[in-house]
Design a protein with these regions (language model features):
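Local cysteine-cluster metal-coordination motifs and their immediate loop/turn environment
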Residues: 157, 299-324, 334-348
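Iron-sulfur (Fe-S) cluster-binding modules
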Residues: 1-35, 353
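A short, compositionally biased
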Residues: 69-71, 265-271, 309-311
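C-terminal accessory/binding modules appended to enzymatic or scaffolding proteins
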Residues: 268-305
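Ferredoxin-reductase
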Residues: 26-133, 137, 144, 169, ...
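Short flanking/linker segments adjacent to small metal-binding domains or redox-active Cys/His motifs
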Residues: 205, 285, 348-354
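A short, sequence-level motif marking secondary-structure junctions
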Residues: 90-94, 286-291, 328-332, 345-347
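FNR/FR-type flavoprotein reductase catalytic core
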Residues: 5, 115-279, 283
Length: 354
């Protein structure tokens, strides 16, 4: 009998002994980060950055394929017995010698996963991982001059870039309520002292919101720079309009943590949402994503980036109609129709197959 046949026979015997579980289930207990298993990671440390932000150090399993600076990773976290998926920018350099990766998370009001990771996550905790993805990255050929325009947690993908690639001429404008709210502030000021970065901090509690028109004074050559911008929708909307008006829109690269949502009339007032697989029915307005509606109702909803990019939330629409919060387009139920629940809201009564 060949060695392959012997291994196959031994595996079948193990399956008989371990039924109803599989041998792989026990292997997952012994070696959860092994190759061949679902991609997992182990939290090895949590380092506070500000009062409401922390860096989470993760050792990914053997199936991890690495990342490009600026990309994000979807992470599945068990919170109060429910697995929730979120997407966070990777803040570690690509060549970290110990093989670990970091994400830096800012806790947001009512954010189940962000608050869990910042305030409750412990070393040793296992999390699910997807492969890194995203196109908010620097080109292979380093730009001669770069501007980073960031606000709040929008600094996280840019910090991954700063740690990974040293540029000859890099300028950053970063907005935060107060100096103590600037994530990575000490590290940024070390880069400034080493003349690797020119930094302007806008403290919105005292300075007010950044007026994009101030760029002419803060960075006189901004229109000549390749710009990477990440932050709240208001900042990015203003930047896109400003760059477009000056004919240099192609030099602006943006990353949104939430989709841009259009405001519609009174006709889009929502409706009754039925989650047929779980038998739950709730009322929803016409502006709240069905993903949020389901989670609030206790329905286990697949999710990922929560901004309409990764398609991790796609779900069959069995009946009724929904509205795309980005475009206002109405989708009506018909056989085979899938919707993105993170960017779709009820447009009247609807039935979601969850």
């Amino acid at each position: 009998m060949t060695s392959t046949a012997l291994r196959s026979r031994a595996w079948k015997l193990l399956e008989m002994v371990t039924t109803p579980l599989l041998p792989s289930d026990y292997l997952d207990l012994v070696s959860p980060l092994r190759a061949g298993a679902d991609l997992r990671g182990r939290i090895e440390a949590v380092h506070p950055e500000t009062g409401d932000a922390a860096t989470v150090v993760i050792r990914p399993g053997r199936g991890w394929r690495g990342h490009t600076a600026g990309q994000y990773v979807r992470i599945g976290v068990d919170v109060d017995g429910v697995r929730l998926w979120r997407a966070y920018s990777i803040t570690s350099p690509t060549n970290r010698q110990d093989g670990r990766v970091t994400i830096t998370v800012k806790a947001i009001p009512d954010g189940k996963v962000s608050n869990h990771l910042v305030r409750r996550a412990k070393p040793g905790t296992l999390v699910q991982l997807d492969q890194a993805t995203g196109d908010f990255v620097l080109p292979q050929a380093k730009p001669a001059k770069v501007l980073y325009l960031t606000a709040g947690s929008g600094i996280t993908p840019v910090m991954g870039m700063l740690r990974d690639i040293e540029l000859d001429d890099a300028v950053m404008i970063h907005c935060a309520p107060q100096p103590q709210d600037v994530i990575f502030r000490d590290e940024l000021h070390v880069l400034v002292a080493d003349k690797k970065l020119r930094l302007t901090e806008v403290h919105t509690d005292t300075d007010g919101m950044l007026d994009i028109a101030r760029l002419d004074d803060l960075v006189p050559d901004w229109a000549e720079r390749e710009t990477w911008a990440c932050g709240p929708a208001g900042l990015l909307d203003a930047a896109e309009e400003h760059w477009t008006e000056h004919g240099v829109r192609e030099r602006l690269h943006t990353e949104r943590f939430r989709p841009g949502i259009i405001v519609t009339g009174d006709g889009d007032s929502g409706g009754e949402v039925t989650f047929s697989a779980t038998g739950k029915t709730v009322d929803a307005d016409g502006a709240t994503p069905l993903l949020d509606v389901g989670e609030e109702a206790g329905v286990l909803m697949p999710s990922g980036c929560r901004m309409g990019i990764c398609f991790g939330c796609v779900t069959p629409l069995k009946a009724g109609a929904v509205r795309d919060l980005r475009t206002g387009e109405i989708t009506e139920a018909e056989p085979g129709v899938l919707i993105q629940t993170c960017v779709s809201a009820a447009a009247g009564p609807c039935d979601i197959e969850r």
